[in-house]
Amino acid sequence: MPTTVLYMEERKGQDPDPCYLREFDARLTERGPDYVVLDRTAFYAEGGGQPTDIGVLRWPGGEARVLRVAKEKGVIKHVLDAMPASNEVHGVIDWDRRYAHMRYHTSQHLMSGLVWKIFGARTVGNQLYADRARVDFQPAAFTPEDLA
């Protein structure tokens, strides 16, 4: 069963906007050797040059660190350092990291639009990190004056 991705939900009239969810409640639908699948999540799964969210899943009497989040055929796997003792969990995203990635992502789109308009170069790749971002353009025939 696919995982409901909370930050992709309809935004009209929602407060806060689902993109800004920092915490959520969910039920486990699957357990693997080092991961769980939830019925719903606000954790971003790695993809499109953007790193995975990290954070914690909490339940009465315990918590596990979310080390990585991966998406496979609509199912989102949360790789953990410990398995939950409950099927009901409360997820908490590392918001500082997520928000930095959101800002880099938006900046990448702005830069890509400007580079396309001014230089006719398309974005062919990008990678976001916690403290920086990289964007690849093609054709990348910039002169030293262009980059000054």
Which residue stretches match the model-derived regions?
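A glycine- and charged-residue-rich anion-binding loop/surface
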Residues: 1-148
